[in-house]
Amino acid sequence: MMLVEEAAPDAGALPVAALRGYLRLATGFEMATDAAEDAALAGFLRAAIATIEARTGKVLLRRPFRLRLEEWRDPARQPLPLAPVASVEAVEVTDAAGQVAAIEPAAWR
């Protein structure tokens, strides 16, 4: 099983201002300093979110993922490694010859 994050969370989705307020960080006299501080805070938030998501299996910020399986765990169902799942865009299977076939949504919903 390979789970790939296709896109990082939007920078606007990170609560940098809330973290800055919680930490009671003062604003500096130079805007460049504030921008560098905001970038550092965003990096700390991303690291914290990644740690929490890895330990809990819960996604905190919505973004697309791609799941690739070598085989189904159970023919009737396949548990997903992360939750909550907002939507499943497609289910495709690849045969031994490398041909990809899309499975109709009615067959997997």
Language model: regions and residue ranges:
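Divalent metal-cofactor coordination and adjacent catalytic microenvironments
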Residues: 1-109
